[in-house]
A protein has these predicted regions:
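Short, hydrophobic/amphipathic alpha-helical patches that form generic packing surfaces
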Residues: 86-95, 169-190
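Conserved small/polar residues in nucleotide/adenosyl-binding loops
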Residues: 195-196
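Exposed, interaction-prone assembly regions rather than primary DNA-binding/catalytic cores
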Residues: 104-105, 109-181
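Basic helix-turn-helix/winged-helix DNA-binding cores
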Residues: 2-111
Length: 197
């Protein structure tokens, strides 16, 4: 029974390699209205929803991002491809960072690269970052599988299978959580220095 569970868990971790994300060449190269942006994001990121009714992006969110200076104002109610890139970064960051931290991270990037004429703009920044993260996904999956196997060795002295599995699952969750906590702490420390750029 536990072998099947372990195989299922490894399959789940490997499925992360197939999660929906928006590739740079999928970002429309035209300005879009807010409804078009929310539809686009919903269509392309639906597999990352935890529950079917979850919203990836709403009009209210976009308006709040603009009010909080995370997103430059639209131009005649239309949003450029670079607005879309910022919305993607916000979408990914908001899962683990505060709005203030996101603002600190994006402000210098937006200031320097939003509608930049010097050859590098937010689209080229996204392309570079996307490529690097895409290449790292296999490493991340292998690391999680290693942590799963290591967690399965925890509590080996417990004879009750159900109790041991419960505790080894908890150990796996704690291992992943610790990894997230450490990385989040590093990001927050870097964010402090961002205010000086």
């Amino acid at each position: 029974m536990h072998e099947k569970y372990d195989r299922d868990m490894i399959d789940l971790l490997r499925s992360i390699q197939n999660i929906d994300y928006i590739e740079p060449d999928e970002i429309p190269n035209i300005d879009l209205y807010m409804d078009q942006i929310t539809t686009f994001m919903d269509d392309h990121l639906k597999s990352s929803k935890r529950f079917e009714d979850d919203k990836i992006l709403t009009k209210t969110m976009i308006n709040n991002y603009s009010k909080n200076n995370l997103l430059p104002p639209s131009e005649k109610k239309k949003y450029s491809p670079e607005h879309m890139v910022l919305l993607l970064f916000i979408y990914y960051f908001k899962n683990f960072l505060s709005i203030n931290d996101i603002q600190s991270i994006l402000a210098p990037i937006t200031k320097r690269f939003f509608h930049s004429e010097n050859g590098r703009n937010l689209n080229t920044v996204y392309e570079e970052i996307f490529q690097r993260q895409y290449e790292n996904i296999d490493f991340e999956v292998r690391d999680m599988i290693r942590k799963l196997r290591d967690s399965n060795k925890a509590f080996a002295d417990i004879e009750d299978d159900e109790e041991r599995k419960l505790l080894s699952n908890f150990a796996f969750i704690c291992s992943l959580s610790f990894d997230i906590w450490v990385k989040k702490s590093v990001i927050e420390s870097i964010t402090v220095s961002y205010t000086h750029l």
